[in-house]
Amino acid sequence: MANKKIRIRLKAYEHRTLDTAAGKIVETATRTGATVAGPVPLPTERSLYTIIRATHKYKDSREQFEMRTHKRLIDIINPTQKTVDALMKLDLPSGVNVEIKL
């Protein structure tokens, strides 16, 4: 291939599904003969939302909700055409966002 590296960035709300998806990608890439660096855990984004429990008054009574976005980075170095074909056919769990840069 002309490009020497494929960078895959994974995002998910649950870290277990993210780790299984990363494991599938790493296993597929190593099986087809490419060199893999990662999965590298990136910092987790944490979004915190505070709402008032009551509808009209009692502003001191609040509730907080949090949403965490876990991220992983995988570099595939010197991929072959067989590696790219295998990655295109790979079935990943739902709930995992995949960004690929060539």
From Swiss-Prot:
Pfam families attached to this UniProt entry: Ribosomal_S10 (PF00338)
Assigned keywords, A-Z: Ribonucleoprotein, Ribosomal protein
Single GO biological process annotation from the record: translation
One GO cellular component term noted in the UniProt record for this chain: ribosome
A single MF term (Gene Ontology): tRNA binding
NCBIfam families per UniProt: PRK00596.1, rpsJ_bact
Subunit structure: Part of the 30S ribosomal subunit.
Family, similarity comment: Belongs to the universal ribosomal protein uS10 family.
UniProt-listed PANTHER family: 30S RIBOSOMAL PROTEIN S10 FAMILY MEMBER
Role played: Involved in the binding of tRNA to the ribosomes.
UniProt protein name: Small ribosomal subunit protein uS10
Annotated gene: rpsJ
